[in-house]
Amino acid sequence: MRKSPASLPSEAFSSSNSSLSNSYSDGSDLANWEEYVSTDGSLFYMEYVRCEKTGVSAERRVEFMRRSLRLGKKSSRRQPHSNNQNQSQNQNQSHGPSRLDSQTEPQEFRFSQFKTAAPDPKKLDLVITAADRFRFGRRSTAVESILGFRVLPFPDQPECLMVDGFVHDVSALQHGIKRGDWFRSLNGIEVYASNVDELLKQFVEPTQVCLGFQSCGAASAVSPTDPGYNRNVREEQVCKVENFPMFTEKFEQMLITEGNFGIPGSSVDIRMPFAMLLLPPECYQHEQQQDSLYYFPEIPDNFLFKARGSFLTLHAVLSELHTQPLSSRLLVDQVQYHVNYRQLNGFLVLFAYAGGLCCAAECSLRSDELIGYIRFSLPGLVLESFNQEREPGNSSRLKLFLRHFCEIQRTRLVARCHGHIRFEELLGQSRSLPLPKEAQLRIFDALSEMEAMDYRNWNDEPLTTHREFFIYGSALYYDGFLVASLLPPEVRVSVEGFLRCRGIFELLGAAPGIKVREMYVWEEIVLPSATGRYFLTICTKNHLSLAVILKIFDAPDMAPDAVVGPSLFYIEEIQETLDHLVQCGIESLAMFWSVSNKRPEVLDATASESRDQEKEPNNRLESFLKQKLTVLSPSVEEEAQLCSSLGGSSIHSLTPSEDESCRRRLTPIHGTAEDSDSGSDWENFAVQHPLHYGLNLGAESHSQSQMTESMWKEINNVVPVKISAGWKNSVLHYVYIDIANGSLFAPFTDSSENSNYLSEIRQACHIIHAVLQKSKHYRRHLSESSRAQTNSNGHSSHTVSLVKEHGMILEVSTQPKSDGQSQSSTSSRFVVVGRLFQSPAKEVYVCHRSDVPQNIVEMAFRLSFFSMG
């Protein structure tokens, strides 16, 4: 916020309060990222931990154990980090015993230890008032705002609260209060998780209160040698990335070495997997342009640099024929390369990809993505920009940007390709993750409240205060999937290109050895056909990323080229929104939904192959069942699929008119005869869904789920739904592209067993996509010419029929497993169909089995409901 000169003292007070978070892990007045802001105002800061390849459930269970129950409120303070690991031991001792205990060895505090430990009561006198309820944010808890410390429920006694950390240096640190102490009483009244908020809100006027604590000493904490110690909770070494050049240096190590990507003999053996050349077409007409402006790799053996004259000649010859070159295929040192030509502000840009890593269609889509990112990041790139770089004493910031950009693309290509064909990841649309309606409403409420920015609850001078920035729009992502967006589609495409080409999406979703705890990105951008200065802000917490575009308030006293650094207040507001979404269970729901394979269900290729082998013995039985269909009652699975509603976008698969017996059949059986609304049914939900609660079901439950009961009950009744016709599901893959909204809906996970099948399916999708794109281009050309030239009767003279639907039949052979037995290779036949729709504009690609004919129009109609959530 920006204030008038008369309100500067209150501004210092307001900013100091609003910026308190775990970013102040070293006890200073600066956030953990503030000292890494560059001279031009940009910021790239990340904290991550290296985690071993344990099960997903183990990692998620530890995460749930560390969370607190905020009753739907958003915490404005995140968990403290161990940022002082590189400091000396004397410095660690000077910060108090609480920080020293948290850095020596991991401890798990239990309420049962207080029964055996000697009582060590502590008291703390404070003057509190309920007027401080919102001084740390809109949804900060009452304990944080009024008392100044955070509390957590004990794992074995959720009703009792323990001290988890301190918001700032309150007097509690001077009285020996430390992490793990039992927050026992307030003015002699026992404090529990259910009554702490009501007790604190009663003090309307400033009142002196006495807080009672009981210490949890070294004997009270569970040590690693105790049998009750949870070994999954281990000390995590936090690593920092202070700027983007440092991120570029570590990106290959994080994504390939620690992510265990790369296949020996394929992508690693290629000496030059990616190359780039940027040069002006008139480089031989002027002496100062004899050499190319930039080429990567910056080595003399770069074949693009050595053959730049041939590329310029080809470009000049085709330009005289009123056409442009698109791609070339070269053979360099027995390695095939695909070279794509692109135009950028009068420059000729060449991208070369090794043919063993990706096909020609993939290279074309990748080149479109890269040139879009360069156009978005360098909108004013002209020849003079490079001439300024040659001046002595001037920093080569532009060439450093291009070098880092190319290094990231080379690592992305090596890590993500290695022979596996990609299709939906390379399209310009956003890969959406449609969550249930209740979750979508909560997300949009949180984003709308963040954009509203109502300061009246904690702003002392609202009349003399105005916003420093205006929020242009925001978008929420889970890994690389779009969860919700309040951005225009064309702007969102540019933002996602920024996230992909910077390697952020690959790091979040494709590096299992890396867990990103926090990330902050601040960079000035230029929006097309928009006035003013805009800044892209990206905040990441675990798997959730929130991208926000801010527009600065045009102050009269601000210079047009003034350096604008990151806004501490706005970054904290964005991070608070992320904390609120994580606490509401959005991250857990997105993780569950991305691997559920229910809406709609797709077949596993290996299961489909085994079904082919069993098909012949079961032909007679199936024919008998078809004849007796009117006599025999349908099975539970068939009846569940028939009762599933495809006529609406709600995630509920039941309608009010359905009877209770059908509802019981659709509800998973939990060992009791009660329905899904009973308490025992909800308690046994963890057994049926170990992905959310962890596979260690024998251990005692340490914390409640952050997902609300209504949201989990909403997805509890969800059954797998098929979009194909026939008795059984026959769909293996689908891609639903909504061109109007700029979104894409496809299966979320790729199994390693299905990689060969998916590569063939995506290759067929590339071929069909090229046919449909040519049809769309010719349709536009035909409509323009038909409007100019029409017959007297009003009909066009062109009678060429355009392609709306195109299909292919694939036969994939599988090699027998090397188990010592002689087995013959089997083959499976699939049908890949793509169709182009006009109103609304969309493309649909479906791969299904060839034994049952399908109607792609009907399948596209069913997919349209699931794409909305």
From Swiss-Prot:
Plays a role in the definition of cell polarity via the planar cell polarity (PCP) cascade. Acts downstream of fuz and accumulates asymmetrically in wing cells to regulate planar polarity in the wing. Probably acts by regulating ciliogenesis. Its main location: cytoplasm. Belongs to the inturned family. InterPro entries: CCZ1/INTU/HSP4_longin_1 (IPR043987), CCZ1/INTU/HSP4_longin_3 (IPR043989), CCZ1/INTU_longin_2 (IPR043988), INTU (IPR039151), PDZ_sf (IPR036034). Interacts with mwh. Residues 70-80 have a biased composition (Basic residues). Keywords: Cell membrane, Cilium biogenesis/degradation, Cytoplasm, Developmental protein, Membrane. Residues 81-97 have a biased composition (Low complexity). It comes from Drosophila melanogaster. Residues 1-28, 70-106 are annotated as: Disordered. GO terms for biological process: cilium assembly; establishment of imaginal disc-derived wing hair orientation; nervous system development; non-sensory hair organization; vesicle-mediated transport. This is Protein inturned. Disruption phenotype: Abnormal wing hair polarity and in many wing cells forming two or more hairs instead of the normal single hair. GO terms for cellular component: cilium; cytoplasm; plasma membrane. It is found in: Cytoplasm; Cell membrane.
